[in-house]
């Protein structure tokens, strides 16, 4: 069991962040990939991580995630949503998944994109995906989403999973709104599948 150390200045530092770049650096310093439940940390790659996500995880508020110092992509996207919303940015939160029934081995992901206030270009803000960390800028929103899609395909392929055209064609991308605090793993997914906007076909036409 990991001991959760609370930094008394952490929330003050978060509240003083002025730019997306500062938010990224804050998350680099204070947010690690994993989930914390009742003082115990479950880390990516460990045997108990996936089971804990499916059975024990509950969505915390962005401030509680910051306090714990741990979050997987679903959690970290809520920190990002909180900051970009409070600072009046145009942004979207997105969920990408291979829609395969029965024992789906493919990894899903959530992330945020936003419009830069200086040049109106769209940026993919990525902290949870360690292979693609950073702020990546594109001319359009569609370019940002399609670039992330290609990286998502690459990552799943790196896990030695089959990546045929038929498999790629199962990818769906949803634009989703803030889920309910306290949501279980299944409730989080149900919120997306029942309420989110499926933008897959729209993107395919533009790619």
Model-flagged regions — what are they?
Residues 1-207:
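A structural boundary/capping signal
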């Amino acid at each position: 069991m990991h001991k959760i150390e609370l930094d008394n200045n952490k929330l003050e530092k978060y509240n003083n962040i002025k730019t997306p770049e500062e938010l990224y650096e804050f998350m680099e310093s204070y947010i690690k990939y994993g989930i914390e439940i009742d003082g115990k940390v479950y880390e990516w790659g460990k045997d108990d991580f996936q089971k804990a996500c499916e059975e024990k995880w509950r969505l915390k508020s962005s401030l509680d995630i910051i306090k714990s110092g741990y979050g997987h992509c679903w959690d970290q996207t809520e920190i990002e949503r909180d900051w970009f919303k409070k600072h009046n940015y145009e942004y979207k939160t997105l969920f990408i998944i291979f829609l395969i029934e029965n024992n789906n081995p493919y990894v899903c992901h959530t992330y945020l994109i936003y419009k830069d206030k200086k040049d109106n270009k769209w940026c993919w803000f990525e902290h949870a995906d360690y292979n693609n960390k950073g702020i990546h800028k594109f001319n359009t929103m569609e370019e940002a989403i399609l670039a992330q899609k290609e990286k998502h395909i690459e990552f799943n392929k790196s896990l030695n999973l089959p990546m045929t055209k038929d498999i790629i064609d199962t990818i769906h991308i949803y634009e989703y709104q803030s889920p309910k605090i306290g949501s279980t793993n299944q409730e989080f997914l149900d919120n997306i599948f029942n309420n989110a906007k499926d933008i897959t076909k729209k993107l395919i036409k533009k790619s």
